Amino acid sequence: MASNPYTRTTMEGHTVAGNAFYATIKLSVTASQTSYYSLSIPAGVQDVCVFMSREMVTSSNGAWLISHYPNAVVDTTGTPFPVFNANPQSAKQTQLQISPVTVSVAGQPVDEVYLPASGRRIGGNYPQGSIRVQSEGSLVVGAKSITAGGSADLYITYTWIQVPNIQDL
């Protein structure tokens, strides 16, 4: 595995009304490397349980993706714990509404976001409430190409709201 190609320079998180969380993260990324990383949940938001592990993949042409998976989250003590349970019978299963989402590389919005479960592809910036992701799904964010060996800053700003009733979806 290559050395980490990024430096996390900013992370700010806040709770809203006890059931929502939003954060702004800045990553300084060097392309043409592959790395795995996860983000810690700030104190006081463990109950929301919505941060997911990230896998950064660099392809041969210098483009890269950040994929979100429902596992391998670390809390403030560094202990991994599950975020989603894909068992429909699980009382812990939730719907997440992500709103708003703005992703940019070097100040430019990403090309699109792909939701594998539905096959939807949407632009890189979203009005509030425009994206729904079921707990058994993943969210894949595709960034603009970065020339191999180049670098750019990645900004992600997002809000997660926990909705207990997924049965109605």
What are these regions (language model features)?
Residues 2-169:
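Beta-strand-centric surfaces of beta-sandwich/beta-rich domains
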